[in-house]
Amino acid sequence: MASLKDLRDRIASVKATQKITKAMQMVAAAKLHRAQEAVEAGRSYTQRMDALVTNISKDVDLVDAPLLMRGTGNDHVHLLVVCTAERGLCGAFNTQIARLAREHIQKLHAAGKTVKILTVGKKGADILLRDFKSLMIDHVDLRSVKKIGFAEAAKISKQLIDLFNEGAFDVCTLFYSRFVSVITQRPMALSLIPAGQNPVDEGQDFVDQAKSREVSQSAVYEYEPDVASLLNDLIPRHISVQIFQALLENVAGEMGAKMSAMDNASRNAGEMINKLTVTYNRQRQAQITTELIEIIAGAEAL
């Protein structure tokens, strides 16, 4: 049985931990509000960009389409871009994304495909390194970036396009977590290259793309100088926008998951403090009772 001193020390330790988890919860809540605003603002732009590319691509012959759109004609080498958080303490957020990527890798291997992995975020890299170290070709470290901006997405996009032009892969798929609510984040797999493809997994990429495409379906476009030249400029930006939106979704999802995790941790700490306090009071009461009995017994002996 723990001594009273041990119980006091343990109660103090749990209270200190609870203060930390509550502070982290408040910080995550503040960051979540800003991240959620960025996600909602970005979704509209991403929707329209996707609809624009989809509709313009209908007016160009496949042979005249940019290589990023028509692809290599093969699907043997797959590059998986797995985006996770740089830090932990956010529940199963990182694990869920890595699990979806792992399932996709297993399916590709079963189909005889070659798989390469590029990770964005330390936690996802740590998880996948355990089983797929030989498949890793690069890692993007964003720990020094205080606020995710379009510049970070553009750098990743340029790296992917350069690799594609060098013939490093045929198909590129982006893994991230779509922000649904504070307690719900949905792992997604989105086809990046060839551009204009459908999502790899069930559901829609970002927000109901079918609806956004339908809205712009009846639009009539005139192109200057020509549709192929326009797509050559538009497709790289489209890829950058998709990556940027995925990063924004990840930030919001991470903050939501962290807020929930820290709230649960604070509640658990509170329950533990109550239990330890009850145990401490009982032991203290028993000790006082024993001391009184000893004093009374000594007085009677006199």
UniProtKB/Swiss-Prot annotation:
Keyword match Isomerase: no
Keyword terms of this UniProt record: ATP synthesis, Cell inner membrane, Cell membrane, CF(1), Hydrogen ion transport, Ion transport, Membrane, Transport
Organism: Bartonella bacilliformis (strain ATCC 35685 / KC583 / Herrer 020/F12,63)
Subcellular location(s) of the protein: Cell inner membrane
A GO molecular function held by the record: proton-transporting ATP synthase activity, rotational mechanism
GO cellular component, one term: plasma membrane
Gene3D superfamilies linked to this entry: 3.40.1380.10, ATP synthase, gamma subunit, helix hairpin domain
Name the record gives this protein: ATP synthase gamma chain
GO biological process, one term: proton motive force-driven plasma membrane ATP synthesis
Repeat in keyword set: no
Assembly mode: F-type ATPases have 2 components, CF(1) - the catalytic core - and CF(0) - the membrane proton channel. CF(1) has five subunits: alpha(3), beta(3), gamma(1), delta(1), epsilon(1). CF(0) has three main subunits: a, b and c.
Predominant cellular place of this UniProt entry's protein: membrane
Protein family according to the UniProt entry: Belongs to the ATPase gamma chain family.
Pfam family, one: ATP-synt
HAMAP family: ATP_synth_gamma_bact (MF_00815)
Function summary: Produces ATP from ADP in the presence of a proton gradient across the membrane. The gamma chain is believed to be important in regulating ATPase activity and the flow of protons through the CF(0) complex.
Coiled-coil region: none
Membrane-related topology note: Peripheral membrane protein
Domain of life: Bacteria
